[in-house]
């Protein structure tokens, strides 16, 4: 019969065998026999089994040099570690709620009548991908350079992919934690999606919104005809970020809402100038001015009567015609500010 002191000496001697970098000695290639590498996901349970036979007098499971169980006696203070079986043929333990710090080598050590023998198994802990740091939503001016960051953790290390979610079909994919955009354009605004993938679980996906500011551009401003006594409506549509503010002028006079039978309504990209009862004096050239913090632009629009000769082109085709008038209007705007 073995004295307890002998067992202590045995375990201490066995522990010396597991110095990092030193191969584990094993007297018999088939005894004891532990499992191959065990792979589990973070949060799951891991079962470590060791096959033994009736030659075994003492058994123990160790994590590196720390004894977890010696026979039925628990040495570990970790309540997640429990013994499953201690029979003549198998000695196994279970680790509940496995975490990344549980990863590493585990050793089944046995004492026979002759000498200690060991067998090792490596526990691999897989961790689902998780994005741990990502850029906040950002607003920049057109032409600026932008860097978006998306840092992810997981085991195996996840692959990080950036994708532009564009409704115009101009989306692109970049496989890197950092996405760099040089000279950003208004078409590159919108949501950017970061995905972290490692095949352990579903990808972790998060989004960043990129807003690109740009000066106003008048996209629609058409001449309009109306008879005396009828309603006439001039429309001016401008694209801009931030949204443009509109002003209306006749020649060099700024029009005020509600005066002289006109109403000015501006909502989003569209501004309208409405004449409720058109008179002869209302006919003529009007200028729509769209302004935001990055700049301004203007378009000339004509309200004409029946039979009048007019240019029905859009705002772009009439830009040169309004140049002199715009110089006058700009001077007036500067005085107003």
UniProtKB/Swiss-Prot annotation:
Domain (Ig-like C2-type) ranges? 32-119, 129-211, 215-302
One GO cellular component term of this record is:
side of membrane
Propeptide found at: 315-337
Signal peptide residues on this chain, from the entry's feature table: 1-20
The topology of this chain with respect to the membrane is:
Lipid-anchor; GPI-anchor
Q: List the disulfide bonds.
A: 50-108, 150-194, 236-288
Summed up, the tissue specificity of this protein is: Restricted to the nervous system.
Q: Which family, according to UniProt?
A: Belongs to the immunoglobulin superfamily. IgLON family.
Listed name of the protein: Opioid-binding protein/cell adhesion molecule homolog
Source organism per UniProt: Gallus gallus
């Amino acid at each position: 019969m073995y004295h307890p002191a002998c067992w202590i000496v045995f375990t201490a001697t066995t522990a010396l065998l597991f110095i990092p970098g030193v191969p584990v000695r094993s007297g018999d290639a088939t005894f004891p026999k532990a499992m191959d590498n065990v792979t589990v996901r973070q949060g799951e349970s891991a079962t470590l089994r060791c096959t033994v036979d009736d030659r075994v007098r003492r058994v123990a499971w160790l994590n590196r040099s720390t004894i977890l169980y010696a026979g039925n006696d628990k040495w570990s203070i970790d309540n997640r570690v429990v013994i499953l079986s201690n029979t003549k043929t198998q000695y196994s333990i279970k680790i509940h709620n496995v975490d990344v710090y549980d990863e590493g080598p585990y050793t089944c050590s046995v004492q026979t009548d002759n000498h200690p023998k060991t067998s090792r198994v490596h526990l691999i802990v897989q961790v689902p991908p998780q994005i741990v740091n990502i850029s906040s939503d950002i607003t920049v001016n057109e032409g600026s350079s932008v860097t978006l960051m998306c840092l992810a953790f997981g085991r195996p290390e996840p692959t990080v992919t950036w994708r532009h979610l564009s409704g115009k079909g101009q989306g692109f994919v970049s496989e890197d934690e950092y996405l760099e955009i040089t000279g950003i354009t208004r078409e590159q605004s919108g949501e950017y999606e970061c995905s972290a993938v490692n095949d352990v679980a579903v990808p972790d996906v998060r989004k960043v919104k990129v807003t690109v500011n740009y000066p106003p551009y008048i996209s629609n401003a058409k001449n309009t005809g109306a008879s005396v006594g009828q309603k006439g409506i001039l429309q001016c549509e401008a694209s801009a970020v931030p949204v443009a503010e509109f002003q209306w002028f006749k020649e060099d006079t700024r029009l005020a809402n509600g005066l002289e039978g006109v109403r000015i309504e501006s909502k989003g990209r569209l501004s309208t100038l409405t004449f409720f009862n058109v008179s002869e004096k209302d006919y003529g050239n009007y200028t729509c001015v769209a302004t935001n913090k990055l700049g301004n632009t203007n378009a000339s629009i004509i309200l004409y009567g029946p039979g009048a000769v007019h240019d029905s082109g859009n705002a772009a085709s009439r830009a040169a015609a309004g140049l002199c008038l715009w110089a006058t209007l700009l001077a007036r705007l500067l005085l107003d500010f």
